[in-house]
Curated annotation (Swiss-Prot):
Monomer. This is Pectinesterase A. The record marks 177 as: Transition state stabilizer. Substrate binds at residues 109, 153, 219, 226, 230, 267, 269, 272. The keyword Transcription does not apply. GO terms for biological process: cell wall modification; pectin catabolic process. Disulfide bonds join 192-212.
């Protein structure tokens, strides 16, 4: 018996030592901490990014727990942010599209972003990215209040057309209107949590979401029986095969205060675009959102329409049936099969595997 116990103890010590060695073997090119004063650790993420050498070799930054009030633009390829924990390592800013710059101009939707990705092969893991613009407080103001911001889009994460192969693992994105803007390349979101109200996942990029929570937030400014928001607003070009693809995920409510049938799965965004014959809603933005094997709470009612401007400046409507909006094996209180919620066949659903959506890119972490 003693021999067996000794052997078990020895094995346990070997395993513990192996785990310790594996952790010690994890190397970071830079470490960020709000509390360290050893002279080797950066106090801001921006300073850590600036320390990365030119080139495109992998550069990995460990972000210790803390709230970092920073706005970041990533332009270096192969940069990787690793948080100490998803809820503990927080990058936050509070800028809305209507927030004024020092010169009096507005930041605009894209300019409101807390983090902007304009590089290839970026990754973020185990951290939170927030846009802390106080949407509820702003909406509670009187329309006659000069401090009330009219353009309330407030992006937490923006992947630009210069971005490609952006990988987000165990990341929380927090905002209200326009939380996540994917405008270019390919992005992969795995085990993530994305919360918002109006069009909180939008854009014309290709983005695959797997095992994610899409969280609809409560709005005190919306009267009972009215629509509170929309999960997606894709503007995918007609020649692009994939847009926003959500698989094996959960469409949930922030709390029971979110009413039943108050959120749409998506609406078609045709962004106002300048053409040779004028400026009007892009007719080629035949947006795609597809939900596969995803559970839906009862706050979901289906798809919706969205307005735009024609060549003469008149309001026109774009209907969901004219877009690429589909579901496959949705389930839960918010799932239903009807003519207004088109379903994929098994053969069609087979076209939405990770390898097909992301092509020649297999997401990996450093």
């Amino acid at each position: 018996m003693l021999k067996t116990i000794s052997g078990t103890l020895a094995l346990s010590l070997i395993i513990a030592a192996s785990v310790h060695q594996a952790q010690a073997a994890t190397t970071y090119n830079a470490v960020v901490s709000k509390s360290s004063s050893d002279g080797k650790t950066f106090k801001t993420i921006a300073d850590a990014i600036a320390s990365a050498p030119a080139g495109s070799t992998p550069f990995v930054i460990l972000i210790k727990n803390g709230v970092y009030n920073e706005r970041l633009t990533i332009t270096r390829n192969n940069l990787h942010l690793k948080g100490e924990s998803r809820n503990g390592a927080v990058i936050a800013a509070a800028t809305a599209a209507g927030t004024l710059k020092s010169d009096g101009s507005k930041w605009g939707t894209a300019g409101s972003s807390t983090i902007t990705i304009s590089a290839k092969d970026f990754s973020a893991q185990s951290l939170t990215i927030r846009n802390d613009f106080d949407f509820p407080a702003n909406q509670a103001k009187s329309d006659s209040d000069s401090s009330k911001i009219k353009d309330t889009q407030a992006v937490a994460l923006y992947v630009t057309k210069s971005g490609d192969r952006a990988y987000f693992k165990d990341v929380s994105l927090v905002g209200y209107q326009d939380t996540l803007y994917v405008s270019g390349g390919r992005s992969f979101f795995s085990d993530c949590r994305i919360s918002g109200t109006v069009d909180f996942i939008f854009g014309d990029g290709t983005a695959l979401f797997n095992n994610c929570d899409l969280v609809s937030r409560y709005r005190a400014d919306v009267k009972s029986g009215n629509v509170s928001g929309y999960l997606t607003a894709p503007s995918t070009n007609i020649n692009q095969k994939y847009g926003l693809v959500i698989t094996n995920s959960r469409v949930i409510r922030e709390s029971d205060s979110v009413p039943a049938k108050s959120y749409g799965l998506g609406r078609p965004w045709h962004p106002t675009t300048t053409f040779s014959d004028g400026r009007y809603a892009d007719p080629n933005a035949i947006g795609q959102t597809v939900f596969l094997n995803t559970s839906m709470d009862n706050h979901i009612y289906g798809w919706d329409k969205m307005s735009g401007k024609d060549k003469n400046g008149n309001t026109i409507w774009f209907n969901p049936e004219d877009s690429r909006f589909f579901e496959y094996k949705s389930y839960g209180a918010g799932a239903t099969v009807s003519k207004d919620r088109r379903q994929l066949t098994d053969a069609q659903a087979a076209e939405y595997t990770q390898s097909k959506v992301l092509g020649d890119w297999t997401p990996t972490l450093p």
